Every structure is written in structure tokens, then in C-alpha cells.
Amino acid sequence: MATAASNPYLPGNSLLTAGSIVHSDAAGAGGGGGGGGGGGGGAGGGGGGMQPGSAAVTSGAYRGDPSSVKMVQSDFMQGAMAASNGGHMLSHAHQWVTALPHAAAAAAAAAAAAVEASSPWSGSAVGMAGSPQQPPQPPPPPPQGPDVKGGAGREDLHAGTALHHRGPPHLGPPPPPPHQGHPGGWGAAAAAAAAAAAAAAAAHLPSMAGGQQPPPQSLLYSQPGGFTVNGMLSAPPGPGGGGGGAGGGAQSLVHPGLVRGDTPELAEHHHHHHHHAHPHPPHPHHAQGPPHHGGGGAGPGLNSHDPHSDEDTPTSDDLEQFAKQFKQRRIKLGFTQADVGLALGTLYGNVFSQTTICRFEALQLSFKNMCKLKPLLNKWLEEADSSTGSPTSIDKIAAQGRKRKKRTSIEVSVKGALESHFLKCPKPSAQEITNLADSLQLEKEVVRVWFCNRRQKEKRMTPPGIQQQTPDDVYSQVGTVSADTPPPHHGLQTSVQ
């Protein structure tokens, strides 16, 4: 590196050409390689050779267009190697290509072939682009960053999506912004090389072009900004949009998630986030929403089956009419509400109390409970109608239930005899009740209950402040009333007044 041949800053250095150190921007998206000398001071036509005797780069050509000419330290390092290989700088170019992975090797080979076809040089002279540590202005030597070189593999090549940085991230400044001007001498060759490189990269990297499969782990890198494909500097897409629009040049494969420093888990699926025109199926990694809103948990009315559909649900008018008919039929058949509740429990397994049947007949249950009870009562009515006139299970069930004696209707004559006896003796003995029952041809229990009810009625009729008098006392007082002593109720009225 101390020899004159390896010093890139001498104006008469014969080892450097514009094509080997010039890197295009996004508008051209290509590497070096041109028929005439670049910058504005090189040789014209096909005269720019790589022999020591030809001075392709002069001081004026080097300093003529600093915005379109960039010199890389890795290119300078090849000067000494070129001097030891017969004066040809590109003797190790194809060795670097073979050391790359298959996708980058194919892209680099395609770019080299395109440059050879469009350039009079004997080799695919495309200079290597530097890492983001190179300075914006080429004259001063760029600082040596903490980039780790990979030996024979030349991991400092930084081929587009080819090699992964093994060392710490670069600490140097980012690459300069894309340039807008190119010397006309090598623009065509650079554009051809860029197109070939982009096509080869798209063909061998389906995960970037179509987004159908994730890239290998070795294709991930963390280089922000531009990167290189076989020495050609490629910047992020220009005004043409993602993928290189009109004048956009080669497509930038820098993933925005990698620039932002996302986690490796997200970087694995970065092809889903890349801007491309091809549709791709959604990946399970991005389906972070709720599991499902349909199917088993579709919502109310969809997954829950109502036992009574809209057609079977009766209206309030139907329930009212049925309750009225049910009560009439039940009384006609001679069954009590308790009998119906017991029969429903024995026949259908649903035991209902007498209160429930009473509330159903009075329409005092909720609409839901009325709808549930209606079909059961309807079945009971059908069973009771079919068994009319013959003892069936319903009759047996009613007999097994709580026995309730029918209300006894007492004739007027019999009732008068009982009333006269009550005035004489409101609380007869058991023997007197038996004799009275025999004389009136009534059951003993009926006579006993009548006297009990009559005494309760007498208590309700007598005010609590007045001492209860027996009928004999009342009759005797009525018979001995004189004009001087008013009846007791008159005194009451006087005291009230």
C-alpha cells in the first residue's frame, strides 16, 4: 500500500479508471463501466484500458464531478493486488463472485456479463461499493470502521441481500444522497448493468419479488441506506416509487423494518411488509386479532337454538284464550288445580304446584313461563278428554292426590233448623251433633263444620268492645225492655254523640 501503484490519489495513477470507482445512484441504479472516461476528463470512445501505460483517470477527471464519482477504500486495496497480477485489476473479480451465496452470485454474474457486453474492457470492471462508513466527499481517505472482514469470502463486498454483517453495526456516516447527473460517456453501460443486476436479483430472490416465501437467514442484514450488488451502489427507490418507476432505477431491497431496527422475529417475515404489486396470502404471524367472530361464536341468534321457534311461539291473545278454555274444561272434568299440577309431575316429569296452575289461569305468569306451560297443559287436556267416562291414569292420579270434598249445598229448611239450634246452643257437644245430623239426614262432619263456621261468623259480627251475649240473653232482654230503660244500642249512640 506504500507503493505508487497502490496510491489512488496520484493524478497519473494508471490502475484506476472511472468505471472501477464510480457508483451510480437510484436514477441509474448501476455500477461502473463505461466506454469513455467518467467525470468529464477521461479518455473517449473505447480507449480507456486497464494497462499500466494508459492513464484513464487524471486529476481533473477525479475532481471534475465529485457528486457522481466516489472512491472506496476497498477499491484502493485492489491496486496492489492488480499490480501483482499482471497489471489487471479485475483478476479477483470472479473469485469474489464464486465466494458469494447462490442468489448473489447469480446476480453478480449477470451484472458482470452485461458490463462485458457493453464495454470494450476485457473484464467486468465494476468497482466494489463501500459500506455506509464511506464519507460523502471522496478525496480524504475514509475511516476504517469496525467492519469485520471475512477473509477469502470477502464479506466487505456487501452484495445486495447476499451477506449478513457478522460484526457490530457501522458507526460511520450514511452514504451520500443520490446524484442527479452522470457523464454521458458511461451512462448507457451503467444502466445496462443495473437492469441486468435487478433482473437477476428478482429472479433469484422470489421472496423479495413476489413475497411467497421467507428469505434464508443469511440474506438478512442491518445496513441502513444503500447497498451494493457486485460493486454497484443501489440506493432506495427514487421518485418512481417502490420497485423503480419511471427513472427509478433498480429496486431497493432495503427493508424498512430492518432500518428501524425491528426484532428478528419481524425480520423473518419482512417480505410481507415490502412494497410490491403482487398480492400474497395473509401470514398467520400477522393475524393477531381475535380468533374468530363467526362459526361457533357467531353471536346471539346464530349459535343458540331457541327451543321454541318463531312459528311455535304463541301470542298473548292465544295464551289468554287457552287459559280461559283450560279453566272451563278443568272444572267441567272435575279436577282441581292441585290435581292438574300433580298429574303433570307424574306424567311428564315436571311437577307444578296448585299456585302455578292458578296463576296460569289468571294470566299472572311471565310470558316465557306461560309459553313453557301451555304445551304441557294442552297435552293434559287431550289425555283427560280421551279418558272421559272410564277410569284412567289421570283419575287414579287425582284420587291419589289431596282429597278435597266438594262444597256442600245446604237447603234452606235444613239451614233454618241449624240456625235455631245455634241460638239455643252455639257450641253443641259431639253427641248433640250426631243426633242433629241424623235428624237432618246430614253427615256428622257437615254439621260440625257448620257450627264451627257459624261461631266464626258470630265473632266477626260482634264488635270487640261489647261483651258477647248468648242468644238466650238477647231474647230475655228484648222481653223485659220497659219504657224507662232504652235498649243498649241507644246508649251507645248517645255516648258516640
Curated annotation (Swiss-Prot):
SUPFAM superfamilies: Homeodomain-like, lambda repressor-like DNA-binding domains. One of its GO terms (molecular function) is protein homodimerization activity. Homodimer. Residues 403-462 bind DNA. GO terms for cellular component: nucleoplasm; nucleus. It holds the Pfam family Pou. SMART domains: HOX, POU. Keywords: Developmental protein, DNA-binding, Homeobox, Neurogenesis, Nucleus, Transcription, Transcription regulation. The lineage of its organism: Eukaryota, Metazoa, Chordata, Craniata, Vertebrata. Residues 465-483 have a biased composition (Polar residues). Residues 269-286 have a biased composition (Basic residues). Transcription factor that acts synergistically with SOX11 and SOX4. Plays a role in neuronal development. Is implicated in an enhancer activity at the embryonic met-mesencephalic junction; the enhancer element contains the octamer motif (5'-ATTTGCAT-3'). Can fully replace Pou3f1 in Schwann cells of embryonic mice and rescue peripheral nervous system development in these animals, although severe defects in forebrain development are still observed. Residues 32-62, 121-189, 230-316, 458-497 are annotated as: Disordered. Brain. Disruption phenotype: Neonatal death at least 36 hours postpartum. Loss of both Pou3f3 and Pou3f2 leads to abnormal formation of the neocortex with dramatically reduced production of layer IV-II neurons and defective migration of neurons. Residues 32-51, 240-250 have a biased composition (Gly residues). GO terms for biological process: cerebral cortex radially oriented cell migration; chemical homeostasis; forebrain ventricular zone progenitor cell division; kidney development; metanephric ascending thin limb development; metanephric DCT cell differentiation; metanephric loop of Henle development; metanephric macula densa development. Belongs to the POU transcription factor family. Class-3 subfamily. Residues 311-385 form the POU-specific domain. This is POU domain, class 3, transcription factor 3. PANTHER family: POU DOMAIN (PTHR11636), POU DOMAIN, CLASS 3, TRANSCRIPTION FACTOR 3 (PTHR11636:SF125). Its main location: nucleus. It is found in: Nucleus. Residues 133-145, 170-180 have a biased composition (Pro residues).
